[in-house]
């Protein structure tokens, strides 16, 4: 009997995805990878409780077009780049029973999207910037009786789910101000786009006007010369040369001066290296060493590190 599986998003995430979809959602792609927001948290119903399943996610192109943001909206700008076979990622929980999958939402929060085609990170999916994509979750029935087995591509496909309102356009910088406001409002980690950072975003955006000036410069009454965009480079950090640390001479008992050997050393100032091994021939003395503790460089190194950190912070 075929499972009648029903898949949707968790209620709060479902509302967010629909809200973003209304404004044509955008997702940032970077070389180091970026997690998606809103999250993909699927709610699965209809699985056989005692059967074993594995969940897989891939992101496929929504169409064969390239897009650009022009006059406040996304428009088609040509044919899409040649797409490679979508990378498919198994859920980190591996193989679990239908009862376990249906108990909690299936969350793919470890997946990151990147624009680096050479990335070998197992949790990253490569996407072309300025292209539209749709996430797809697939459910496979596992033939193994062990819940600890590794999912295999040959397992039977139960269903694949494509939710049209989860599609998005991959970008290297957000283009739509409405999307930015939604990201700031609902994403607690969108600190890079809080107040005061939108001007920076527009300078990095390929569709923004580079002639825009800062608000502070427009408030100056007298004309000011344009400041050239120069990069402030701090002078190279020179290694600090520590003064030569000479260990103090060992404390010599005055009794030793009566001995010929030590009286000669006291006159010349050439004391034996420490630790000094006393000869067995001297009476009343142990052959154990009497070392003088070396000077501690711990405080010197600590002060040097603090100075370097202060220089780095000032730059």
Swiss-Prot record:
GO molecular function (one): DNA binding
Keyword match Oxidoreductase: no
Keywords: Developmental protein, DNA-binding, Nucleus, Transcription, Transcription regulation
Consequence of gene loss (knockout): RNAi-mediated knockdown causes about 5% embryonic lethality with 1-10% of hatching larvae displaying posterior morphological defects. Defective intercalation of dorsal hypodermis. Simultaneous RNAi-mediated knockdown of tbx-9 causes at least 48% of embryos to fail to hatch and those that do display severe morphological defects and die as larvae. Simultaneous RNAi-mediated knockdown of tbx-9 abolishes muscle expression of vab-7.
GO terms classed as biological process: cell fate specification; embryonic body morphogenesis; positive regulation of DNA-templated transcription; regulation of DNA-templated transcription; regulation of transcription by RNA polymerase II
UniProt biased composition (Acidic residues): 305-315
Region described as Disordered: spans on this chain: 193-235, 293-315
SMART domains noted in UniProt: TBOX
Compositional bias ranges of the Low complexity kind: 205-225
Composition skew (Basic and acidic residues), residue ranges: 193-203
A single GO cellular-component term on record: nucleus
Subcellular localization, as worded in the UniProt entry: Nucleus
Pfam family, one: T-box
Segments crossing the lipid bilayer: none
InterPro entries: p53-like_TF_DNA-bd_sf, T-box_DNA-bd, T-box_sf, TF_T-box, TF_T-box_CS
Function recorded in the entry: Transcription factor. Involved in the control of early morphogenesis of the intestine, hypodermis and body-wall muscle. Involved in regulating expression of vab-7. Appears to have partially redundant function to tbx-9.
Protein name per Swiss-Prot or TrEMBL: T-box transcription factor tbx-8
Organism: Caenorhabditis elegans
Name of the gene: tbx-8
């Amino acid at each position: 009997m075929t499972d009648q599986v029903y898949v949707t998003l968790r209620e709060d995430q479902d509302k967010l995805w629909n809200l973003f979809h209304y404004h044509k959602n955008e997702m940032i792609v970077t070389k180091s990878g970026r997690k998606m927001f809103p999250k993909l948290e699927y709610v699965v119903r209809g699985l056989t409780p005692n059967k074993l399943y594995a969940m897989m996610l891939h992101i496929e192109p929504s169409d064969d077009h390239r897009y650009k943001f022009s006059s406040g909206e996304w428009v088609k700008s040509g044919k899409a780049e040649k797409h490679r076979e979508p990378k498919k990622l198994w859920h980190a929980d591996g193989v679990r029973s239908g009862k376990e999958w249906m108990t909690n939402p299936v969350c793919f929060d470890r997946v990151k999207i990147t624009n680096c085609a050479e990335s070998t990170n197992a949790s990253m999916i490569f996407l072309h910037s300025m292209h539209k994509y749709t996430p797809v979750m697939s459910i496979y029935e596992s033939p193994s009786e062990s819940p600890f087995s590794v999912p295999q591509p040959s397992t039977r496909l139960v269903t694949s789910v494509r939710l049209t309102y989860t599609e998005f356009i991959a970008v290297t910088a957000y283009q739509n101000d409405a999307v930015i406001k939604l990201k700031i409002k609902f994403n607690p980690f969108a600190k890079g786009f809080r107040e005061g950072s939108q001007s920076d975003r527009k300078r990095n955006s390929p569709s923004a006007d580079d002639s825009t000036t800062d608000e502070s410069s427009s408030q100056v009454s007298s004309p000011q010369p344009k400041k050239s965009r120069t990069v402030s480079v701090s002078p190279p950090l020179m290694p600090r040369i520590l003064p030569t640390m000479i260990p103090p001479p060992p404390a010599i008992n005055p009794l030793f001066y009566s001995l010929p050997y030590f009286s000669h050393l006291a006159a010349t100032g050439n004391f034996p290296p420490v630790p000094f091994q006393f000869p067995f021939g001297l009476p009343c003395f142990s052959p154990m060493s009497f070392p003088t503790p070396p000077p501690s460089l711990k405080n010197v190194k600590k002060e040097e590190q603090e100075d370097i950190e202060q220089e780095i912070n000032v730059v």
